[in-house]
Each structure stands twice: as C-alpha cells, then as structure tokens.
C-alpha cells in the first residue's frame, strides 16, 4: 500500500504564542523550572496542530519526569554567558566561544536524550507513539555544523534545515515516518521578514505565531498502512 502524505497546520493564536513563548523563556532563565516551560509549550503546540486527515496530536509528557535534565540543559546554555563576567571586554567573545565549544559534547548528549523523550511523548490519535533513533555521534556532528554556521551569518538556515531533515528522518513509529521539507533559502527569507517586523515591537506576537506556523507547515507525516494504525497503539518506553 502506498504511503499516505499528511500535512500539518498550526492554528494557535498570536497572543497565545507570545504568552507561551514568554513563559518558556522566563522559566528557562530560572533554570530549575525549565521543564515546566518546555512541557507547557509542547502541549499547547500539539493541541493547536491540525493534521490533514483529521487525526489529532497530543503531548503526554510530564515535566516532573525530566525536570532535572531540562534544568541541566538550561544551565549549560547559560554557562557561556556567565563565564564572560569579570573578563575584560576585548576577551569576552573569545571566552564565550571557547566555553561554547568545550560544552558542546555535553550539550549534545543532554539534548539528544531530551529529544528522544519528547518524541516518545507525542501521541497520534488514531495511532500511537514513535521514537527517535538518531545517534549521538551523528547529532553531535550536526550540532557542530550548526554552531559553526552561526558565525557565517547567512549559512545557519541551511545548516539548521539540513539538521532538521536528518532528525525527522530518524523518527520511527508503527507505519509512520516524518519528513521536514523546509529549505535554507526559505528560512533565511522568513527570518529577514521576522526580524524586520520585530523591530516594530507591536507585531512580535504575530511574528511568533508565524514562526510556529512555518516550522509546523513544513512537517509531513507519512502513513504506510492507515488501517493498521487504527488497530495498533505503539507503546514506547524511555
């Protein structure tokens, strides 16, 4: 049976996008409650994402299960900026860069574990769960490429979209696969538009909604056997 191509559409509101993103940012800066910000954002995203075939997405993860790892990740991502304190202005950029590079293998390890947990907590109804099979070495390699591309200013969208295609290609479920169709050029153009609108301050909630819509709209779900999905629920243990 040929695979069924299913598009995704994000229908969340602009002010809700602003509120959830702001909550996520605040809780991440506070480090310890970072998991509650992430879970709240993911649950809201899943509840507001519609699939072309009428299926429903839900996020069933609990922040209390993974709060420590989310806190560790938030701390690791803030650490390079903290390292610049007390350093002379002409050396701050170098200190941040060195700290970022040194911490990258550990950041990759924590992120990959969290990504696997997040994918396992997403449910498709009718259907079930999935798992992320991406390897640590592969993900670390992509993270190095994306991090290095940030310093080129214009190449990071191409690196980021390539990494997202690689990650989505490693999502496995019962009769289901995921692909990401966004391009680097498309993301670069959208980013310039988002930045231009954000300068005006007022459109920021709509900019955030557009960001969620763009990334969600470039996800595709492929079902190889629709009838089997209606009968089988995949149990994923992390």
Show where each model-derived region lies:
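Membrane-interface extramembranous regions at the lipid-water interface
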Residues: 1-22, 37-72, 112-142, 161-190, ...
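Hydrophobic alpha-helical transmembrane segments in multi-pass membrane proteins
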Residues: 16-38, 64-111, 141-161, 189-212
């Amino acid at each position: 049976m040929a695979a069924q191509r299913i598009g995704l559409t994000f229908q969340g509101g602009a002010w809700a996008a602003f509120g959830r993103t702001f909550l996520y940012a605040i809780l991440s800066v506070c480090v310890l409650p970072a998991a509650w910000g992430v879970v709240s954002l993911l649950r809201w995203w899943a509840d507001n994402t519609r699939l072309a075939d009428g299926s429903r997405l839900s996020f069933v993860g609990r922040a209390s299960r993974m709060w420590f790892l989310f806190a560790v990740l938030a701390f690791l991502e803030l650490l390079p900026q903290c390292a610049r304190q007390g350093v002379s202005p002409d050396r701050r950029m170098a200190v941040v860069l060195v700290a970022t590079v040194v911490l990258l293998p550990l950041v990759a390890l924590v992120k990959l574990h969290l990504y696997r947990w997040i994918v396992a907590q997403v449910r498709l109804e009718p259907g079930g769960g999935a798992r992320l099979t991406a390897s640590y070495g592969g993900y670390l390699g992509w993270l190095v490429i994306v991090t290095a591309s940030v310093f080129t200013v214009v190449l990071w969208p191409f690196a980021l979209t390539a990494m997202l295609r690689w990650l989505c290609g490693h999502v496995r479920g019962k009769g289901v696969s995921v692909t990401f169709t966004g391009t680097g050029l498309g993301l670069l153009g959208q980013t310039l538009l988002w930045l231009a609108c954000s300068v005006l301050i007022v459109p920021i909630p709509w900019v955030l909604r557009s960001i969620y819509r763009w990334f969600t709209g470039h996800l595709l779900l492929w079902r190889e056997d629709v009838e089997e999905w209606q009968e089988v629920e995949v149990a994923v243990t992390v």
